[in-house]
């Protein structure tokens, strides 16, 4: 009986005794920066708001979005996401930078040497890389470089991005272990490298066949000037769109890669929350990922307009 009473009290505390529609409205109210709350000291401490004006026993306030507390740990979801998100963003950024550094030059050289051995090699590798899921790449890299070749590479199969320094002036402080970023970034970047290589190659071959490129050749422009000044800026439009889309998609791929390497980021946090039915953490992670997708797509449109002057006109 005491357990039933405690369960009822907990349901009331979490608002689970209300109808589902009411729960949704209160959750949206908690998320909104401009919201309606009771002017009670406990509410002020909970929501950390700034009061605008009062409406009886209620007040309209400005506050940061309140993502509630974890069912499992009791900590604020915003604090948990605040520790996990930077690690995942760093991982996704490292993967997409690696993809750009490898994919764009490889696509350019493959297009300039069409039907050569380099072109065939680039097409074969990109097709193979695109067909491999991120978690398969992660397992293979962990097995080969983190296990079998560990003595030569010094890389770990499983390792957190941060840890305590064991020597030096920052002894005992939390520091970034950069070598633990390498394998997850490579595993996450395999498919973006493949798609960027294919898109760059196709776009460059299309641009190089345009009339204005033939005119540039007829005027005696050097091959380097023609490629880097005239062809490449126009060929980068679809590549920029792909990069922006893949950056957001890498957050989803990170869910699998982080668990393979025990990388304590957003993906690992979300998977653990799903396994433990920690709904507030799952909702917070989903909302953040959705916001990133929207923000990245807006940024892609801006970059597309900057690169392609025709769009600006």
What is the role of each PLM region?
Residues 1-29, 39-46, 149-174:
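Hydrophobic alpha-helical transmembrane segments of membrane transport/permease proteins
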Residues 1-19, 78-83, 100, 109, ...:
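N-terminal signal-anchor/first transmembrane alpha helix
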Residues 5, 19, 23-26, 62, ...:
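Generic alpha-helical secondary structure signal
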Residues 16-101:
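An internal, D/E-rich "acidic patch" concept
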Residues 85-90, 94-118, 134, 147-150, ...:
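Alpha-helical transmembrane segments of integral membrane proteins
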Residues 142-146:
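Transmembrane alpha-helix termini and helix-breaking/packing motifs in multi-pass membrane transporters
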